[in-house]
Swiss-Prot record:
Identification of the protein by name: Peroxidase 51
Annotated source species: Arabidopsis thaliana
Highest classification ranks of the organism: Eukaryota, Viridiplantae, Streptophyta, Embryophyta, Tracheophyta
Entry note: cofactor: Binds 1 heme b (iron(II)-protoporphyrin IX) group per subunit. Binds 2 calcium ions per subunit.
Active-site residues (renumbered): 67 (proton acceptor)
EC assignment: 1.11.1.7
Note: There are 73 peroxidase genes in A.thaliana.
Keyword Cytoplasm: no
Compartments where found: Secreted
Any GO MF annotation of the entry: metal ion binding
Family of the protein in this entry: Belongs to the peroxidase family. Classical plant (class III) peroxidase subfamily.
UniProt binding sites for Ca(2+) 1: 68, 71, 73, 75, 77
Binding site for substrate: 167
UniProt keyword Methyltransferase present: no
Amino acid sequence: MVVMNKTNLLLLILSLFLAINLSSAQLRGDFYAGTCPNVEQIVRNAVQKKIQQTFTTIPATLRLYFHDCFVNGCDASVMIASTNTNKAEKDHEDNLSLAGDGFDTVIKAKEAVDAVPNCRNKVSCADILTMATRDVVNLAGGPQYAVELGRRDGLSSSASSVTGKLPKPTFDLNQLNALFAENGLSPNDMIALSGAHTLGFAHCTKVFNRLYNFNKTNNVDPTINKDYVTELKASCPQNIDPRVAINMDPNTPRQFDNVYYKNLQQGKGLFTSDQVLFTDSRSKPTVDLWANNGQLFNQAFISSMIKLGRVGVKTGSNGNIRRDCGAFN
């Protein structure tokens, strides 16, 4: 057995830190300038076309990006389909609720990029997902921002790698902060990225515990607004089909804005992991700040999304460019 002294341990941590930062340092905005200069417009056009078909494209793509980056980094490994010999990430129970429109957005954008002769097999699925995510945020009324590019697609995808990597709707602030810290993201990044819940929906089963069986003292979570409880119970009665979905933001579910934080101030966070951002004194001042200033929230969200896009990236020979986003080459 090798005993590691403090010096060697510090050197190991430093080497890992440098390796992570060297990978993300290879990302740049003009990565495809010489190979596929119009790639961002091609992707945006494909995303716009997809949104015209269904609004679900927007929250589905945004959620897909988070689930990809938090498991093995932003490498499109969540796109891989399972085979007889490998159960992939997308088939882990925590990913089964990912809407198919998110996957289809990346597939359609990839087809559009590869239809341009000089772009064919030059742009990674990981970068296409990154660009598409930026575009759905902007097309829903959110900020426009520049993305860093140059990711390679991951070479592995397994359901077992997902366990413990994604936040649960029951998480408290300590659990949220710890999970985000594992990905190099700060408490402020966590609060900003939680703001993505201004869009999209969740299944009723994810909130049953807050409505009907919260704890030994209260059947209903006392932090939920009483009028909101009535609304939620009407939408999610106990005998309802578990596949029925409800909006994350009860007020402006199709608009990317700071109303998510205003909702938290009124006790209208859908998940425990949402409402705790307001009930915990450590995060409450940030919620109040962004509830009162949408521009500050947008700036924080952009910064945190760029940081998220650097998590666990593969560059150079650490990955490849998939011909089919759903299968390894």
